[in-house]
């Protein structure tokens, strides 16, 4: 019998699609006269996901509706409902503006760049990355702390456009419809409320340099990267239609907002003294006004280039537990896939997920700190596992997280902890 599906004389079963035997794959699912392996099932799911994404992008002249954008964001980002709504509307309007720019010449629609304000690890970068994936447009990230004014040691602002061009495979037209995410934008705030008499090449100077490309200019980009020199030929990239999303943790901004909102209520004998601020920074951020950003150190022109403002809140224990297990690319699913490659099942108890979430909250690292916690918990197991035989399952309990206890190893013929010999 052919080995493209069914079984042979030795009763070995084969996948009807790829022809692999039951010994070469992890799972073989039986149907009426056919079999399909887990690898082919995953391949089919990938094809369906890609086709679904393509049909989403192609709908309505290539512009997904805000609800469609929000739905995909929900698959990858837990919580932050208000920020997702603001971003969905802003991005939809931005690309609608691009598609209809040539159809209506009477009213010129201004570009609406976006400012994301939220604590470390609250999902700012992930939101921007997911938006670019949904829209199938070139995407690049830049760290504001590495940027300096042209002519100084550091990275030129125009290098951001070069990175976007590289992400678009040097297709200038595609790059001009891309998305740029600038992280740590709060780190380029002016060092004091008063204009500096000395050159601030990594603060206000960078804000001034970013103004032009964010508003719209034709940037001369050296295709080889690095500093410009007269012998190079430059590529001309119009930044007018590039969407800029800036994000930052803005440490200390909550105190500026609180002091403004309290005002002068505590002056005089008859005044009511406001209670001490006991809200989390993420809650206070919702009340941010342009004047607060001005006091923080952003210059007025820069604030004006970021008209859409979305604030992200602190992630609580329940949200962090969901982040660990629910999104399509959740951390737990990633580690389970790694263990599957060793033909071992990884089980993490619900209480263990809660303990991991509490550790991240204690460290004040948000979702960003979850991976390092998972790595430290699973390090010894991942070190030992490839050399062990007969292990079918590894179980992580709350004690493993909180008390550094050994994980439970379940063998094909017995049960033992990580200290047991193979």
From Swiss-Prot:
Zn(2+) binds at residues 15, 18, 37, 40. It comes from the Bacteria. SUPFAM superfamilies: Glucocorticoid receptor-like (DNA-binding domain), P-loop containing nucleoside triphosphate hydrolases. GO terms for biological process: cell division; proteolysis involved in protein catabolic process. GO terms for cellular component: HslUV protease complex. CDD domains: RecA-like_ClpX (cd19497). GO terms for molecular function: ATP binding; ATP hydrolysis activity; ATP-dependent protein folding chaperone; protein dimerization activity; unfolded protein binding; zinc ion binding. Residues 3-56 form the ClpX-type ZB domain. Belongs to the ClpX chaperone family. ATP-dependent specificity component of the Clp protease. It directs the protease to specific substrates. Can perform chaperone functions in the absence of ClpP. Component of the ClpX-ClpP complex. Forms a hexameric ring that, in the presence of ATP, binds to fourteen ClpP subunits assembled into a disk-like structure with a central cavity, resembling the structure of eukaryotic proteasomes. This is ATP-dependent Clp protease ATP-binding subunit ClpX. It comes from Xanthobacter autotrophicus (strain ATCC BAA-1158 / Py2).
């Amino acid at each position: 019998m052919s080995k493209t599906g069914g079984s042979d004389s030795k009763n070995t079963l084969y996948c009807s699609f790829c022809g692999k035997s039951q010994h070469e794959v992890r799972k073989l699912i039986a149907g009426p006269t056919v079999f399909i392996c887990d690898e082919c099932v995953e391949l089919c799911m990938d094809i369906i996901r890609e086709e679904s994404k393509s049909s989403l992008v192609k709908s309505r002249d290539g512009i997904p509706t805000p609800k469609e954008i929000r739905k995909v964001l929900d698959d990858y980002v837990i919580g932050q409902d208000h920020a997702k709504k603001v971003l969905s509307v802003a991005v939809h309007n931005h690309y609608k503006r691009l598609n209809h720019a040539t159809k209506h010449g009477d009213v010129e629609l201004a570009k609406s760049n976006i400012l994301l304000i939220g604590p470390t690890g609250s999902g700012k970068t992930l939101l921007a990355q997911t938006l670019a994936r949904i829209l199938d447009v070139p995407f690049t990230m830049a760290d504001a702390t590495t940027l300096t004014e042209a002519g100084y040691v550091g990275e030129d602002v125009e290098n951001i456009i070069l990175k976007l061009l590289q992400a678009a495979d040097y297709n200038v037209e595609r790059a001009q419809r891309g998305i740029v995410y600038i992280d740590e934008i709060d780190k380029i705030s002016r060092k004091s409320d008063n204009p500096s008499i000395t050159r601030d090449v990594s603060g206000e100077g960078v804000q001034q340099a970013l103004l032009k490309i964010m508003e719209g200019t034709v940037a001369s980009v050296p295709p080889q990267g690095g500093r410009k020199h007269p012998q190079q030929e430059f590529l001309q990239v119009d930044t007018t239609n590039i969407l800029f999303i800036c994000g930052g943790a803005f440490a200390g901004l909550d105190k500026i907002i609180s002091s403004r909102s309290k005002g002068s209520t505590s002056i005089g004998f008859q005044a009511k003294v406001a209670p001490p601020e006991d809200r989390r920074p993420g809650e206070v951020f919702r009340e941010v006004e342009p004047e607060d950003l001005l006091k923080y150190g952003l210059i007025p022109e820069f604030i004006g280039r970021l008209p859409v403002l979305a604030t992200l809140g602190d992630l609580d224990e329940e949200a962090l537990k969901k982040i660990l297990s629910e999104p399509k690319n959740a951390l737990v699913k990633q580690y389970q896939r790694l263990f599957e490659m060793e033909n071992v099942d990884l089980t993490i108890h619900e209480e263990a997920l809660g303990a991991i979430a509490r550790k991240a909250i204690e460290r004040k690292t948000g979702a960003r700190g979850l991976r390092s916690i998972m790595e430290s918990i699973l390090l010894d197991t991942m070190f030992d596992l490839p050399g062990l035989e007969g292990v079918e399952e590894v179980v992580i309990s709350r004690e493993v997280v909180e008390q550094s206890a050994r994980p439970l190893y379940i063998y094909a013929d017995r049960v033992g902890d990580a200290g047991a010999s193979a």
